[in-house]
Structure formats: structure tokens, C-alpha cells
Design a protein with these regions (language model features):
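Solvent-exposed loop/turn segments at secondary-structure junctions
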Residues: 2-5, 29-32, 62-65, 82-85, ...
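Long, Pro/Ser/Thr-rich low-complexity/intrinsically disordered regulatory tracts in eukaryotic proteins
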Residues: 16-19
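Electropositive phosphate-/nucleotide-binding environments in soluble metabolic enzymes
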Residues: 22, 43, 90, 127, ...
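A short C-terminal boundary segment appended to hydrolase-like catalytic domains
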Residues: 97-166
């Protein structure tokens, strides 16, 4: 039983200031209204977590899918979507379960199962609906320079961690 939390490691990003600099004199800000894409500062802080030693970064707060990104050989799930909340917005209905395999060397494989919020219940997304959700995840991930292979026969998708041989 844990009784003293003072000695537990905390996320280094939560205990230090963070500043992003560019090589140009102009400041770059992302004021995009699109919630289906991670903001520049979100990506930067998640990259920082990987740079500081995280093997996997998983985000769940935006309640909508934001895609997957392979960064320095590690996976960032920018947002898995929604799982339980009863938000009544259609864009919060599709979601995913991220599965992984690991061995002593670390994570070796990531698979995606599509899910859907149907009348406030989380259910597996099968058939055409499942493939639409997986294709959406693949498209969002492609925008983050990450390839997600969709297996339409089994309603599953696989993150390709190493694309050097493609």
C-alpha cells in the first residue's frame, strides 16, 4: 500500500517551464479551431516527454480522435477519443482502443480496435462503421507522418513503427 507519494517520480513536463524556440525571428502560433489535430504546443510537449525517456505517450482529454504519431521510434497517441463520457456531439462518438505488445526491449507492436459510443454505451465498431473509424485514424496519423495499416477484413489497424523498408 502506498502511503507516501512524495518520492514518486512525476512527469518532468509538469514540473518545469516549457519554451519553444524557432530559428526564425517570427513567432509561430497555432490558433487552429480544429480539435481533430493536436496543437503545435501539444505536440512539442509530447515530443519532450519522449525525449526525456517516455516509451509511450497516451492522451485522452480532447474526447475526439487526434491520430497517432511515431516520434523517435516511440508512439504518441495524441487522443484516443472518447470512452465513457456522455457528450452529445457526433464527433465524440468514434473512438479507439489501443492495444500493445511488449517484451524486455520495450513495446514491439501497436494495434487499434475501433469503438463507438451508441446511446451512451461503448460498443465495438464493426463492418463499414469500424472501417470508417480506422480510415479516419489512418488519415489523421498520415498527417503526422505516421502510417497506420487498416485491415478491413478484421476491423483492426496496425501502427507501422518502422517505415524505412517501405
Amino acid at each position: 500500500r502506498l502511503t507516501d507519494f512524495r518520492n514518486m517520480k512525476t512527469n518532468p513536463a509538469s514540473s518545469i517551464g516549457f519554451q519553444m524556440t524557432t530559428e526564425q525571428e517570427n513567432e509561430i502560433d497555432d490558433y487552429s479551431w480544429r480539435l481533430d489535430r493536436p496543437k503545435l504546443w501539444d505536440r512539442a510537449i509530447r515530443h519532450f516527454a519522449i525525449d526525456e525517456g517516455a516509451d509511450l505517450v497516451v492522451v485522452h482529454h480532447p474526447h475526439i480522435i487526434q491520430g497517432l504519431e511515431v516520434y523517435n521510434g516511440k508512439l504518441i497517441a495524441h487522443s484516443l477519443g472518447n470512452f465513457i463520457f456522455d457528450l452529445n456531439y457526433p464527433e465524440t462518438y468514434p473512438s479507439m482502443i489501443l492495444n500493445s505488445k511488449a517484451d524486455e526491449s520495450g513495446f514491439t507492436e501497436f494495434m487499434i480496435d475501433p469503438i463507438y459510443i451508441d446511446d451512451y454505451l461503448t460498443v465495438p465498431a464493426k463492418g463499414e462503421l469500424g472501417n470508417q473509424i480506422l480510415n479516419h485514424i489512418a488519415n489523421l496519423s498520415n498527417d503526422l507522418d505516421t502510417y497506420v495499416h487498416v485491415d478491413k477484413d478484421y476491423n483492426k489497424a496496425y501502427v507501422i513503427m518502422d517505415t524505412s523498408s517501405m
